[in-house]
Amino acid sequence: MSDYKFTLNLPETEFPMRGNLANREPEMLERWTKDGLYQQIRDSRIGRTPFILHDGPPYANGSIHIGHSVNKILKDIIVKSKTMSGFDAPYVPGWDCHGLPIELKVEQKVGKPGQKISAAEFREECRKYAAEQVDGQREDFIRLGVLGDWQNPYLTMDFATEANIVRSLSKVIENGHLHKGVKPVHWCTDCGSALAEAEVEYEDKTSPAIDVAFTAVDSKAVAVKFGVSDYSHSVSMVIWTTTPWTLPANRALSISPELDYSLVEFVKDGVTHAVILADVLVEACMTRYGAESHSVLAKIKGAALELVRFKHPFLAFDVPAILGDHVTTDAGTGVVHTAPGHGQDDFVVGQKYGLEVANPVGDNGVYKPDTEFFAGQHVFKANDNVVALLKEKGALLHHVAYRHSYPHCWRHKTPIIFRATPQWFISMDNHNLRKQALSEIEQIQWIPDWGQSRIEKMVENRPDWCISRQRTWGVPITLFVHRETEELHPDSVSLMARVANRIEQEGIQAWWDLDAAELLGEEAEQYRKVTDTLDVWYDSGSTFASVVAARPEFHGHGVDLYLEGSDQHRGWFMSSLMISTAMTGKAPYKQVLTHGFTVDGKGRKMSKSIGNVIAPQQVTNKLGADILRLWVAATDYSGEMTVSDEILNRSADAYRRIRNTARFLLANLNGFDPKNDLVAVEDMVALDRWAVRRAAALQQEIIEAYEQYNFHIVTQKLMQFCSIELGSFYLDIIKDRQYTAKQEGHARRSCQSALFHIAEAMVRWIAPVLSFTADEVWQLLPGQRDAYVFTQEWYQGLQSITLDTDLSDAYWENLLTVRNEVNKVIEQARRDKRVGGSLEAEVTLFADATLTEQLTHIGDELRFVLLTSEAKVLPLVDATSDAVETELASLKLVVNATTAEKCERCWHHREEVGTIEAHPTLCHRCVTNIEGDGEVRLFA
């Protein structure tokens, strides 16, 4: 054999079988950075149609987690696939840099501002801390193979961005959407600040649930309203609440105008009580109160009780019964304790009736000094004292510990309160902002489509947006308000423009350093500077204006796509929509795509306490970023994304299949020069033409899946192509021709041309997902080419040629089915020790007329398709008794061991081996391939 070994075209490539990604990827990243790859991509797309994916900024605090990785990888896949489709798709990563979490970290290090350190120094420390966090996260994101302008990202703390945030607010003000008001807002007593909706989490909490009687000022008159005259007992209206601490701020009792309310007399412990309850809740209440007996004296509609007055249970004033649409009968009594300073519904109904917005609670959650009974007590600790006082006053009908869902601070994980404070708001209704936003939502493509109804409900129900915070590290609300009237300065918009110019030069500290007289002159004494800062959701929500509209690489194009986790419907998607609609009347995006959260193999959230956290850094260090990227792409992101070591190992197995396919392609393109050796598709061997045609059809499907952001379909189709059409069929069949045909002959060059086309297409298909591997393949592909696959477009060399004489896809699919049946019978023969390998087999195919015509069409080349040394086709009716039935009714098979000698070079068993004097160990075909013009192949 040694004489003939060197006549074979054995595969050869520098592309290793093992990816060794964890070690090789960092080397590739160094080259990408050194070569300025991102800029090369930008230069390759000058003048093309822009596609703008705007990066929602992660918070500059802590290490990235698996959810961050999912988000960045999905974005990168889209940007790379859009670039491959010819778009100019810049990617500018960003970071959210202001706000409370950074303040808390800096406080731990240097103390609170104004104590050991000035506010200005504190801000500088916050800026430094945020910059350090950005650097750490940036390295981790780059390691994932995400291409972008990493050296010039946007930071919400950049002076220019801070200035643009102020300019955006001035436009909101100019359009009439800002107002100041005393309103109940989510308030964290630990933060000492208002919280945005997105900063509130709901957790279970145990609270005292109490039923409290408010006695009527004139019980007889109330009884008369029910049609009961000369009634001698006191009549009370009963509320049920889980926040006893809010009772000092009670200013009304809300009832539903449409509900029936009953006057109920009941006896407990020998004492008669008369109470007003929603009729449908009477039985439940009587059971709860432990009534020994009860009777309903009369019923009336709630509307008849409007403005009836009742005594506060422990304060020296009375309160009205008022009508509210927020009253339900899900629980309680059908009467709602109403404290306008401590609840949004209470506030709204209170405004209608002109109620006082009482707020006896300070920033720290402690009752103010003038609060009767409870001064100096923390509200949650005061609950028990309120209950005790109610009991003492005879107003407590029932008390029980009650477990329920309650709002908590996202940062401190502690219960929060609703508290009325003077704040700045973007009004949802003053200038039809809500209506405009709802109209805009309909113009946007939401992916998945349930995102639309989700954000619609949120916009329909959301209160005015409280955009002010009482913090140190944030973009200032750069307003001057009159010291007496609290009115905004009439020139606020132009003043803000001047302040923004200063901030652009000096950063936000410029506002606190500013002497009002510099801008206001003599008016300065009449006005004071606002000291509040902006909600950080305003910072990030305005980046469509402060970043995208401001940076030249976006060409003033506007944003095509926002892509974030599904929690951002109430976060970044919402804040961006509100600000953009308030500024321009239009939404800031055309498409919004959301992905699910990552959970472990059992569907649980990632948690350090459970020990199920999978850190992206560990995955890249062990398996490589391409394995993580393949998992992200292969997972349907519309739901929860399940990840575990086992799942990642499965991704690694799938990756190996793709890598092995790429290696086969490269190894068999050894010595192929497309400039000189490429065979035109119409001149190819029929099977090669089929392979190119399949690749062309697949490319269309893959491009379509990329365009629809269905990356799991891309990976499914790719895996099927590598495993079935290539691995189990085409590549298996062509090995013989590739290795044994004449090196320069048509049979081999046809095959190599098909492999070249497939490799050129496939390297582009995988580039958005398996970026490192695609680069590795690209560097080893034959022919002259640009430095990087990432500057390319989808491969144009695939032609879906259909010649009149061509064998159809259906023909080859039938042949694949026949081949599978033959393989089964040969495998059984091997198990029975009748044959060794398939080349030791002679197969006889007994086929019906239709199948016979197909099988004989390719003549002697059928044996190459079946990988046997001999293949005979005979009529089905002539099937011998030993013929094996197959799953095809049209086919029976007989497999026998060949008696012919084995060719030393190609290993086929042929009758002529031993008859050729010059080459006694070779078959005719091999002699022709060594000494002659090479064998002729037409079909396979």
Swiss-Prot record:
One Gene Ontology term of the molecular function aspect: ATP binding
One Pfam family it belongs to: Anticodon_1
Entry's cofactor comment: Binds 1 zinc ion per subunit.
Binding residues for ATP: K608
Gene3D superfamilies, per the entry: 1.10.730.20, HUPs (3.40.50.620)
Keyword Cytoplasm: yes
Motif extent ('KMSKS' region): 605-609
Residue numbers binding Zn(2+): C903, C906, C923, C926
Recorded catalytic activity of this chain's protein: tRNA(Ile) + L-isoleucine + ATP = L-isoleucyl-tRNA(Ile) + AMP + diphosphate
Function field: Catalyzes the attachment of isoleucine to tRNA(Ile). As IleRS can inadvertently accommodate and process structurally similar amino acids such as valine, to avoid such errors it has two additional distinct tRNA(Ile)-dependent editing activities. One activity is designated as 'pretransfer' editing and involves the hydrolysis of activated Val-AMP. The other activity is designated 'posttransfer' editing and involves deacylation of mischarged Val-tRNA(Ile).
PANTHER family linked: ISOLEUCINE--TRNA LIGASE, MITOCHONDRIAL, SOLEUCYL-TRNA SYNTHETASE
Subunit structure, interactors included: Monomer.
Domain-related comment: IleRS has two distinct active sites: one for aminoacylation and one for editing. The misactivated valine is translocated from the active site to the editing site, which sterically excludes the correctly activated isoleucine. The single editing site contains two valyl binding pockets, one specific for each substrate (Val-AMP or Val-tRNA(Ile)).
Protein family: Belongs to the class-I aminoacyl-tRNA synthetase family. IleS type 1 subfamily.
Protein name: Isoleucine--tRNA ligase
Organism: Shewanella oneidensis (strain ATCC 700550 / JCM 31522 / CIP 106686 / LMG 19005 / NCIMB 14063 / MR-1)
